[in-house]
Amino acid sequence: MEVLKKGTTEALLIYMRDRLGNLTDLNTVTGNTFEVRKKIDNSLIQPATAWTVDPDWPMTAICVIDTNISGYVAGDEYKLYIRYTAGSESPLRGPIEFRVEDD
C-alpha cells in the first residue's frame, strides 16, 4: 500500500492493463477522472479530478493527490477509483488503496 505524507501534493502512478488487448495507450481515452473515498465509511474526499497519462508509459495514469484537502486525516486509509471512456466502454477501475501519514 502506498503511503503519502499529510500536507503534500503527490502523484500516484496507476498502471492499467486491458486483458483483451483492445487498449494499448491511455492517450486515446476520454473522460479521464479519478475520485478518492475514505476506506472506513466510503465518504467522498477528492471528487472527479482529472488524471493524465505518463509520457513514458502509455498505460500508466498519473493521479495527483492533494493531502492538504480537509478530508485527508493522518493514519486513515483511502480508496482511489479511476474512470474513463474508451469507445463504447466506460469502466470504473479500483479500488486502489493508499494511506496518509504524518511522517
Q: Where do the model's predicted regions map?
A:
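Contiguous segments within soluble domain cores/interaction surfaces
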Residues: M1-D103
